From Swiss-Prot:
Subunit structure: Component of the NOP7 complex, composed of erb1, nop7 and ytm1. The complex is held together by erb1, which interacts with nop7 via its N-terminal domain and with ytm1 via a high-affinity interaction between the seven-bladed beta-propeller domains of the 2 proteins. The NOP7 complex associates with the 66S pre-ribosome.
Protein name: Ribosome biogenesis protein erb1
Role, per record: Component of the NOP7 complex, which is required for maturation of the 25S and 5.8S ribosomal RNAs and formation of the 60S ribosome.
Protein species of origin: Aspergillus fumigatus (strain CBS 144.89 / FGSC A1163 / CEA10) (Neosartorya fumigata)
Family assignment from sequence similarity: Belongs to the WD repeat BOP1/ERB1 family.
Record's keyword annotation contains Cell inner membrane: no
Cell compartment(s), UniProt: Nucleus, Nucleolus; Nucleus, Nucleoplasm
Entry's Gene Ontology molecular function annotations: large ribosomal subunit rRNA binding; ribonucleoprotein complex binding
InterPro entries, alphabetized: BOP1/Erb1, BOP1_N_dom, WD40/YVTN_repeat-like_dom_sf, WD40_repeat_CS, WD40_repeat_dom_sf, WD40_rpt
GO BP annotation list: maturation of 5.8S rRNA from tricistronic rRNA transcript (SSU-rRNA, 5.8S rRNA, LSU-rRNA); maturation of LSU-rRNA from tricistronic rRNA transcript (SSU-rRNA, 5.8S rRNA, LSU-rRNA)
Length: 796
């Protein structure tokens, strides 16, 4: 093996190292001997060459594979290539000997290796100490290299802020370790010229690594243009390539596999069930806690910072012109998934709605009925409605309407104080006890001295009003209660009418002086002569079912008690009212079995005559409940369950129909000064649905006032007679009486004034019944009440 070939195999850089024992391995080369031989003794070349031959032979003992691995591992920056070694030999050898070496190398290179210019990638320069310094060329990588293109002006300081070099004239180092000087900055004029003549790729920014203006390349500008124009940055990419239907182009009729579905796909997994049951058992036994409460150490740990998001929350004030959006109306019954049947449209309504234009429809949808909430489908107009709502909120102008700051109490009429409206009854003065059972009715005589009462025991009792002493009593029936007692108006006689069972009894109580008693008996006996003069009815008239009853004389026992006449009505009468002259009175039999033609009867006292003014049932409102004569006109007011009708008896015409709006009328009364001082007719109505209604016939057929102060049904209402005191009262099943002030004037422009005055309580509720009747003293502001507890009370 020749020397040139060995030198070609291994060439080392000449370095000054300490002389040590030569250790040859696959990773290190001892070039100290070779370097010393070339530099110290130029005349011992032959001996040195022999030594080098031995060294080279030792090196050649290694395999070629190890040489290749060593060449790959050695760094090119630390160990020079073959060209570098030969160049070093040229510089260190003698001129004559160096030429021989070069000649040998050239001969070998011409035969075995490329030219020296292609292999050498460095140049030798002298450093500051005069030593040789190898300067390598920049790496020019090819397509197969791992290196990228190296910029000539690249700053290789790494990820270091340039602020570290603010105090130095340079800004970094290049790959050779040379300083990269800070670029010169132009003056104001240069900056102006640069701004006028903007070069292509100018950005106005400064490159942080070089300090020079940052310019974009043509490729970067083209990329920015495509991004700005929403174009595809990559060239040659077609986003609209034709779709290849790989799986749907051919229709497969037969299944790919006809194997039946395995049972495990639709049967619950037993293994999963076992795992779940293990977890459930562990949870039940407490070995697994679904929620582990925090320990006291965690709660009291001060190192854990807990932030309160709403600690510093402050409400933001609304804009001065802020107007809140109007709220949507709440949904109605028609929007329910299971609405009532009356809200569901019929076929005709549905067809009409479908044929109408959307603008002409009264609603945006039709109510539908679903059996359950899970059957309700999605609402198809949901998005449309929300969009229209957004349009309304966005486009519709809003107007702030200023509310009137009016005190609600100022809108109410100024009512006088109850203290200014005295006298009126405030306390119970006398209690009348003696009846067994309920006291259903009572009445005060026109003189104001006597009180008559009737109850469930079938007796009529007369009391002295002020003392409460019983003066007279008569038992009219053994089984039926006394429903009504009324005194004949007028002071010329003392006649008491009472309705018990199917009969009407007329009596003269023996409690007055003989002259008054004789005058009363004469009035009752005068009718017997007129009745005897009337010719008897024909056989055809006698065979009629609903003939008027004939007045009869009472039995001897009743006659001895003071009863003078009996009228057999054949039906139970619940209402009895006298005409103001005292010659007529009207009775009402409201029973459901009572024929309509005999329900209302008018009786003439002077003729002992009974007439039926109505041949047919009053239309609407059910059977009649009560009837009263007008205090100054020949008008009869008849009330059924829901309406009150006024009939002119002289002309036999229907004058007016009143609609109180009550479900069941219990009683009513007419103002005593109607059409005289007040200029119009006024009446009050009580109903079983707890309402007290005031009617002004000149205003409307509807109630002028509706008062709801009772908790239970109202049984009776009554005006103070004579009109001396503008008072009226009502009696209710809640055990109380309520006293009202109700004044009317002759001025047609002013309405009635109604003021609640007093609530009188004293009767006990017995069998869900309280106060059953009420009446006034004819001259004093006193009232008397009858209760279901078997007592009567005088309120003063």
């Amino acid at each position: 093996m020749n020397t040139s070939k060995a030198s070609k195999k291994r060439k080392a850089v000449t370095r000054d190292v300490e002389e040590e024992a030569g250790v040859f391995s696959g990773d290190e080369l001892n070039t100290g001997n070779l370097d010393g031989a070339l530099s110290d003794n130029a005349h011992d070349l032959s001996s040195d060459e022999d030594e080098s031959d031995s060294e080279v032979e030792l090196i050649d003992d290694f395999s070629d594979e190890e040489d290749e691995e060593e060449e790959d591992v050695l760094d090119s920056d630390e160990i020079p290539s073959d060209g570098e070694d030969s160049a070093k030999k040229k510089s260190n050898a003698a001129p004559g000997e160096l030429g021989a070496v070069i000649d040998d190398d050239d001969d070998d290179d011409d035969d075995e290796s490329p030219s020296e210019e292609e292999q050498l990638n460095y140049r030798i320069e002298k450093d500051a100490n005069g030593n040789d310094r190898f300067v390598y060329d920049e790496i020019n990588p090819d397509d197969n290299s791992d290196y990228s293109d190296v910029d000539e002006n690249a700053n290789t300081i790494g990820n270091i802020p340039l602020s570290f070099y603010d105090q130095y004239p340079h800004i970094g180092y290049d790959i050779n370790g040379k300083k990269i000087m800070r670029p010169a900055k132009g003056e104001a004029l240069d900056a102006l010229l640069d701004s006028i003549e903007i070069p292509k790729g100018w950005t106005g920014l400064t490159d942080p690594s070089t300090g020079k203006p940052l310019e974009l390349s043509q490729e970067e500008l083209e990329l920015l243009r495509k991004v700005q124009m929403n174009e595809i940055p990559e060239d040659g990419y077609n986003p609209y390539e034709p779709i290849v239907e790989w799986f749907t182009s051919q229709q497969e009729i037969m299944p790919l596999s006809a194997a039946p579905e395995p049972k495990r796909r639709f049967v619950p997994s037993k293994h999963e069930a076992k795992r779940v049951m293990k977890i459930v058992k562990a949870i039940r036994e407490g070995r697994i806690l679904p929620f582990k409460p925090p320990t006291e150490e965690d709660e009291e740990d001060d190192t854990i910072v807990k932030y309160d998001l709403w600690a510093d929350e402050a409400e933001r004030k609304d804009h001065p012109m802020h107007i809140p959006a109007p709220k949507l109306p709440p949904p109605g019954y028609e929007e329910s998934y299971h609405p009532p049947p009356e809200y569901l449209p019929s076929r005709k309504e549905r067809k009409t709605w479908e044929e109408a234009d959307p603008e002409d429809r009264d609603r945006e949808f039709l109510p539908n009925d679903f059996g359950s909430l899970r059957r309700v489908p999605g609402y198809e107009n949901f998005v449309k409605e929300k969009f229209e709502r957004c349009l309304d909120l966005y486009l519709a102008p809003r107007v702030r309407r200023s509310k009137l700051n009016i005190d609600p109490e100022s809108l109410l009429p100024k009512l006088p104080s109850p203290e200014e409206l005295k006298p009126f009854p405030t306390a119970c003065a006398t209690v009348f006890r003696g009846h067994k059972g309920r006291v259903r009715t009572l009445a005060v005589d026109p003189s104001g001295l006597w009180l008559a009462s009737g109850g469930d025991d079938g007796t009529v009792r007369v009391w002295e009003l002020l003392t409460g002493r019983q003066l007279w009593s008569v038992k009219l029936s053994e089984e039926d209660p006394v429903n009504v007692v009324r005194w004949r108006p007028g002071k010329d006689a003392l006649i008491l009418a009472a309705a018990a069972g199917d009969d009407i009894f007329l009596a003269v109580p023996p409690i007055v002086d003989p002259a008054m008693e004789k005058a009363s008996l004469d009035i009752l006996d005068a009718g017997w002569g007129y009745a005897a003069s009337v010719p008897p009815p024909t056989p055809a008239e006698a065979n009629k079912k609903n003939n008027p009853p004939k007045w009869m004389r009472p039995s001897s026992s009743l006659a001895d008690s003071g009863v003078c006449a009996v009228i057999p009505l054949r039906y139970v009468a619940k209402s009895l009212s006298w005409h103001r002259r005292g010659d007529y009175f009207v009775t009402v039999c409201p029973g459901s079995s009572t024929p309509a033609s005999v329900a209302i009867a008018i009786h003439t006292l002077s003729k002992h005559l009974t007439q039926y003014p109505f041949r047919r049932r009053i239309k609407g409102g059910g059977p009649p409940q009560a009837a009263h004569f007008h205090p100054s006109k020949p008008i009869l007011f008849v009330a059924n369950q829901r309406s009150i009708r006024a009939y002119d008896l002289s002309r036999q015409l229907l004058v007016k129909i009143l609609q109180p709006g009550a479900r069941w009328i219990s009683s009513f009364d007419i103002h005593p000064t109607s059409s005289t001082a007040s200029g119009g007719d006024n009446l009050i109505v009580g109903s079983y649905d707890r309402r007290l209604l005031w009617h002004d016939l000149e205003l409307s057929q509807r109630p002028y006032k509706t008062l709801r102060y009772h908790r239970k049904a109202i049984r009776a209402v009554k005006f103070h007679p004579g009109g001396r005191y503008p008072l009226f009262a009502d009696a209710s099943d809640d055990g109380s009486l309520q006293i009202f002030h109700g004044s009317v004037t002759g001025d047609m422009l002013s309405n009635a004034t109604i003021v609640p005055l007093k609530v009188l309580k004293g009767h006990k509720i017995t069998g869900e019944l309280g106060v059953l009747d009420v009446d006034w003293h004819p001259r004093e502001p006193w009232c008397v009440s009858a209760g279901a507890d078997g007592t009567c009370r005088l309120w003063m």
